């Protein structure tokens, strides 16, 4: 149960007061650096003039406020945010070792976070799938000495299961930066994307690779409009073809000049049949080379069907001059491959060419 003082502070924080009350709010403990602290009555999130903004769709601003208060060693605000419902464990993750025992005592005899619990919290924050969650995760875990005891294999496994993209890096900090950046790009959290890119300009290649891998052509379009694309369209196609059903990214690469034949061949190597037929629908025609590649990777049914070249043709319903992301997504919303359907019908009519594994 909240104390009377804590409850009173909460009521005051939920109301906007004029600047005439600034001195009172400072004395009342509802002040953070350059402005008063507010608690949104609608979304129940906390924000202040400098530190946070209110996101009605996100649910972690209060915990983010706690982490920032811990990093600035503001004990009064730490107590206040915990009383209001912030998870004290999230704060303990960011406490310098010399202050850990003191803060555990202040928060009612809590024990330091164990390694297993640390990894569980990392999963919890990643699973929030919110802009505020991504930014909080970065704030909590990057440059965090507690992770020094976690093996690289364990950390890589946890991050891969959440991001679904292979991560590489010389340090835990770099790995975690790329991890949270990848999550922001996967879900197109624009605010988080811009925050990471502003802090890590050297990660342009990673931003581009993730946008292609996660089919995020909104971000690709932004990079193109700012003329920040740093690699060739065919190399971009290589990233787009890594993941099945990345139709929008493949289409966008083709609009930039990537060859649909190259995309078709990459899709065969990656065993991504749907991407393969999408490239044929876009106009891929070099079936002689595709047949050789399919045979080389033991995809004998594909190799056989490519002998029937007259079966395939470009899908005229895929308009080839759209560059606006939403228009591309809308066009592909009802897309099904006509060439894949023809291939399936041909196999049904000619079972003698089907190779049973």
UniProtKB/Swiss-Prot annotation:
Pfam families referenced in this protein's UniProt entry, alphabetically: ASFV_360
Gene Ontology biological process terms, A to Z: symbiont-mediated suppression of host cytoplasmic pattern recognition receptor signaling pathway via inhibition of IRF3 activity; taxis
Keywords, in A-Z order: Host cytoplasm, Host-virus interaction, Inhibition of host innate immune response by virus, Inhibition of host IRF3 by virus, Inhibition of host RLR pathway by virus, Viral immunoevasion
Chief location: host cell
GO annotation, cellular component aspect: host cell cytoplasm
InterPro entries to which the protein is assigned, alphabetical: ASFV_MGF360
Highest taxon in the source lineage: Viruses
Compartments it resides in: Host cytoplasm
Record note on quaternary structure: Interacts with host IRF3 and TRIM21; these interactions mediates degradation of IRF3 through TRIM21 and ubiquitin-meditated proteolysis.
Family: Belongs to the asfivirus MGF 360 family.
Chain's role: Plays a role in virus cell tropism, and may be required for efficient virus replication in macrophages. Also inhibits the host cGAS/STING-mediated type I interferon production by inducing host IRF3 degradation through the proteasome pathway.
Protein name, per record: Protein MGF 360-14L
Higher taxonomy: Viruses, Varidnaviria, Bamfordvirae, Nucleocytoviricota, Pokkesviricetes
């Amino acid at each position: 149960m909240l104390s009377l003082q804590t409850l009173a502070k909460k009521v005051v924080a939920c109301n906007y007061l004029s600047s005439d009350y600034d001195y009172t709010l400072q004395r009342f403990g509802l002040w953070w650096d350059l402005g008063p602290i507010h608690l949104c009555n609608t979304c129940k999130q906390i924000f202040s003039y400098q530190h946070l903004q209110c996101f009605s769709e996100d649910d972690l601003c209060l915990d983010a406020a706690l982490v920032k208060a811990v990093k600035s060693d503001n004990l009064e605000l730490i107590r206040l945010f915990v009383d209001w419902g912030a998870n004290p464990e999230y704060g303990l993750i960011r406490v310098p070792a010399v202050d850990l025992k003191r803060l555990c005592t202040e928060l009612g005899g809590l024990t330091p976070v164990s390694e297993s619990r640390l990894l569980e919290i990392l999963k919890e924050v990643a699973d929030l799938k919110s802009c505020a969650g991504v930014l909080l995760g970065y704030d909590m875990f990057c440059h965090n000495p507690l992770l020094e005891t976690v093996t690289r294999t364990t950390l890589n496994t946890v991050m891969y299961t959440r991001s679904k993209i292979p991560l590489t890096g010389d340090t835990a900090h770099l790995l975690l930066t790329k991890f949270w950046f990848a999550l922001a790009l996967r879900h197109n959290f624009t605010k988080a994307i811009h925050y990471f890119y502003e802090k890590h300009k050297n990660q342009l290649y990673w931003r581009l690779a993730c946008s292609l891998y996660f089919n995020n052509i909104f971000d690709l379009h932004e990079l193109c409009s700012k003329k920040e694309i740093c690699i060739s369209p065919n190399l971009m196609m290589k990233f787009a073809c890594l993941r099945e059903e990345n139709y929008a990214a493949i289409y966008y690469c083709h609009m930039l000049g990537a060859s649909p034949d190259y995309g078709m061949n990459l899709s065969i190597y990656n065993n991504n049949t749907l991407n393969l037929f999408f490239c044929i629908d876009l106009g891929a025609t070099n079936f002689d080379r595709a047949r050789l590649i399919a045979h080389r990777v033991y995809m004998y049914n594909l190799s056989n069907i490519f002998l029937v070249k007259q079966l395939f043709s470009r899908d005229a319903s895929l308009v080839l001059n759209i560059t606006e992301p939403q228009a591309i997504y809308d066009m592909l919303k009802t897309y099904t491959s006509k060439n894949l359907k023809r291939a399936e019908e041909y196999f049904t009519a000619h079972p003698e060419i089907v190779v049973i594994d």
